[in-house]
A protein has these predicted regions:
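Short, conserved charged micro-motifs
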Residues: 237-246
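Long, contiguous N-terminal structural blocks used for assembly/anchoring
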Residues: 135-235
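Glycine/tyrosine- and acidic-biased, solvent-exposed loop/turn segments at the edges of beta-strands
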Residues: 1-139
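A general secondary-structure signal for short beta-strands and their flanking turns/coil
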Residues: 3, 225-227, 267
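Short amphipathic beta-strand and strand-loop transition segments with alternating hydrophobic
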Residues: 90, 213-221, 257-262
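Short intrinsically disordered coil segments
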Residues: 130, 245-249
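Generic recognition of long tandem-repeat/solenoid scaffolds
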Residues: 26, 96, 228-233, 269-273
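Acidic, proline/glycine-rich low-complexity IDRs
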Residues: 249-275
Length: 275
């Protein structure tokens, strides 16, 4: 019997993910591609559990890192595009057990937790469990100091994310990008027509934004281009900031996208996701 394979695609038609299955579980090499066709991830599975060397690459094709798993046991990692560690966590036979840490792309620790058999626990409980079960990852070193849970931290996290998008080379002011495409396809998120996308962008400018940017434009066939998110620059005037959020809220109401942050925290840009 032939092994079933699930495939998904990016909006530009580029293959996104290939997942081989056996008895409904991942079995074989799972591969994920960036929108530009470059291989992004390669993970080896056996009967639903990671088993073997897993690797991650940047959009430019640079190897960001790799790790080895043995039947669902090991330390899994992901990396930011700039090469810094993004996520690190331990699993034992597929269940979270051990330290779970998450970093921003500026290197700051965003969160750190301890898991035991898939649930978060205190350090004391985990150490006691380790004394009884030698298969659990040892707790070594000191606990980190994640960023405090404050509005200032929320703003910092958002601004770091915005800066990473603004650093993209394949960005453009969205109105010019939509209008200068000629007969070639210019597709913005879930808008079915370019004219509808332009109406929305014009509403943002009318509300008071000074710039609407498509930060991650990617190519398709025959000159087609696609964008799945926007950055909306916010003015300092409170009334205009509220008006812009009101326009974005209509987008969410029509199920054409979502925006962040959901409340004003003094951010420089709103992020609109339309994927």
């Amino acid at each position: 019997m032939k092994q079933p394979i699930e495939k998904t695609f990016h909006r530009n038609g580029q293959l996104r993910e290939v997942v081989p299955l056996r008895n409904g579980r991942r079995h074989g090499i799972v591969r994920v591609w960036h929108k530009n066709g470059v291989l992004a991830n390669e993970e080896r599975y056996q009967n639903g559990l990671l088993n073997g060397v897993c690797r991650q690459w940047s959009e430019a094709g640079r190897l960001l890192g790799e790790y080895r798993m043995v039947h669902g046991t090991g330390v899994q990692r992901t990396w930011h595009e700039n090469g810094r560690l993004q996520l690190e966590f331990s699993t034992v036979r597929g269940d979270f057990s051990g330290r779970y840490r998450l970093w921003l792309n500026d290197g700051k620790l965003m969160s750190e937790e301890i898991y035991l058999n898939g649930r978060p626990v205190a350090a004391e409980e985990y150490r006691a469990a380790c004394a009884k079960d030698k298969s659990l990852p040892k707790w070594t070193g000191k606990a980190g100091k994640p960023l405090p849970n404050t509005v200032a931290t929320e703003k910092h996290i958002h601004e770091v994310f915005v800066r990473s998008l603004l650093a993209q080379k394949n960005r453009a002011e969205v109105r010019k990008w939509l209008e200068n495409g000629g007969k070639a396809v210019r597709s913005l998120g879930r808008f079915k027509r370019k004219a509808d996308a332009l109406i929305f962008v014009e509403a943002l400018y009318k509300a008071g934004t000074t710039e609407v940017i498509a930060p991650d434009i990617y190519a398709g066939r025959a000159g087609a281009e696609f964008a799945d998110c926007l950055l909306v620059r916010l003015p300092k005037i409170a009334a205009k900031r509220r008006a812009i959020r009101k326009v974005c809220a209509q987008l969410s109401k029509r199920k054409l996208g979502a925006f962040q942050p959901d409340k004003d925290i003094g951010e420089s840009h709103l992020f609109l996701s339309q994927s």
